[in-house]
Amino acid sequence: MAIPYLYTDYGEFLRREFPFKVQKISINAGFTCPNRNGEKGWGGCTYCNNQTFNPAYCRTEKTITEQLEEGKRFFGRKYPDMKFLAYFQAYTNTYGEVDEVIRKYEEALVVLDVVGIVIGTRPDCMPQALLDYLTGLNRRTFLMVEYGIESVDDGTLVRINRGHTFAETEETVRRTVDAGIRTGGHIILGLPGEKRDELVSRLPLTALKIHQLQLIRGTRMAHEYALHPEQFHLYTADEYIELVIDYIERLRSDLVLERFVSQSPKDLLIAPDWGLKNYEFTERLKRRMKERGAWQGRLADRREQTR
């Protein structure tokens, strides 16, 4: 049987949205998280070290405009006609006084060649006043709100110190989608003690980022691993490829998949270190999907047909 496609690709999604090439530029806008500052806990998520995904230009001593201009110079060398999405990535980018949060978004949007924004945040940090503003913003520019889901299991969410429940995720995702806003999610595969669950497929998300469990220096999870390594299963690249295929076969076929792995700096990464760049991993994943006769939604679509 011929396989019509393997998965719904993020690059294709962007090509449908824009008539030109676009690149996300990460921003550190000086936010924090409610599970870091004592409102809901201390220390943040047990797996998190924001240094793993902040480029060198993402420093809070620089303004949002300065960070974007540095990012534009970096990416624009290869594609002079490229446009950009301001990616509010570090920490919780809706957490703060609403007027101040809005000011930061508006600063990004007046930078030349910025054609939209992507906002990374938590499902328990979307006040209605801010969602009302974002509803209007969505009418005048490209907007995606990305929620850190990480797990659908409340026990796991407690263990990793997220400070919210999956029910809160469901409620906030639906509010955001009902407002007409493109809505993304992040999920971690391989968290300790967790079984695979496709509840995330029931959420009306536009896009999903999947990434592997990584042990990062300076995190509470790295300390837990040092004390109890038997509680963790660190996947080989081939094992993780099989896990990802099993997972995405059960996802909705129209859910845009932005990535399957994340990369951390070598000096911060404890394990697993596969020695693969993201594109190399993706090519191996595609090859294995073809070998298995697998595609996104294969089992999810079958379940829908039998209901």
Predicted feature descriptions by range:
Residues 51-71, 79-98, 112-126, 142-169, ...:
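Core AdoMet radical
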Residues 23-27, 84-86, 117-119, 143-147, ...:
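Hydrophobic faces of well-ordered beta-strands that scaffold small-molecule active sites
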Residues 75-79, 105-112, 132-142, 174-178:
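Acidic (Asp/Glu)-rich catalytic clusters
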Residues 111-112, 137, 167-185, 231-253:
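Alpha-helix-loop-beta-strand connector modules within alpha/beta enzyme cores
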Residues 2-12, 16-23, 207, 215-307:
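Auxiliary Fe-S-binding modules of radical SAM enzymes
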Residues 1-85:
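N-terminal [4Fe-4S]-dependent radical SAM core
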